[in-house]
């Protein structure tokens, strides 16, 4: 996935929490995206900023096909409960998930979106609740 947003939106924080859940690092900053494949810029490969600790080098994947764009927005920015159906990132044309990056459930929301995109879960069409008659 590609995580983007303004400074202070929680990109590195969310990345750290996703790494703790078993996700792999491609890049913490300056991602190069070519034909849907993301890779780190040469001088930053394997580096991640751990605020309050410093720059850490760790194992990383050299490249991966991106399947989801995660747009982190400031905490005071409202996010619709039910976003536009089939929302796409205008920069990448990837499916788009908007999040508050520092929200406690952000990693779970990313995992659920990835599960839906990879067939491990089913995203129901909006307005379609099982058991509803109308």
PLM regions: where:
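Conserved nucleotide-sensing/catalytic segment adjacent to the nucleotide-binding pocket
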Residues: 20-75
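Conserved NTP phosphate-binding and transfer environment spanning the P-loop NTPase/kinase superfamily
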Residues: 65-134
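Hydrophobic alpha-helical segments, principally membrane-spanning helices and signal/leader peptides
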Residues: 12-14, 36-37, 83
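Glycine-rich phosphate-binding P-loop
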Residues: 1-19
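Generic hydrophobic/packing signal
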Residues: 15, 57, 104-105
């Amino acid at each position: 996935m590609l995580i983007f947003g303004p400074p202070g939106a929680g990109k590195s924080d969310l990345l750290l929490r996703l790494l703790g859940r078993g996700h792999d690092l491609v890049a913490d900053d300056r991602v190069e995206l070519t034909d849907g494949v993301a890779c780190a810029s040469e001088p930053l490969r394997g580096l991640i900023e751990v605020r309050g600790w410093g720059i850490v080098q760790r194992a990383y994947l050299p490249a991966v096909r991106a399947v989801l764009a995660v747009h982190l927005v400031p905490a005071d920015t409202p996010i619709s409960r039910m976003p536009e159906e089939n929302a796409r990132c205008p920069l990448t044309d990837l499916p788009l998930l908007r999040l508050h990056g520092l929200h406690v459930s952000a990693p779970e929301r990313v995992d659920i979106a990835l599960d839906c995109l990879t067939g491990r879960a089913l995203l129901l069409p909006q307005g379609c609740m099982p058991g509803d008659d109308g």
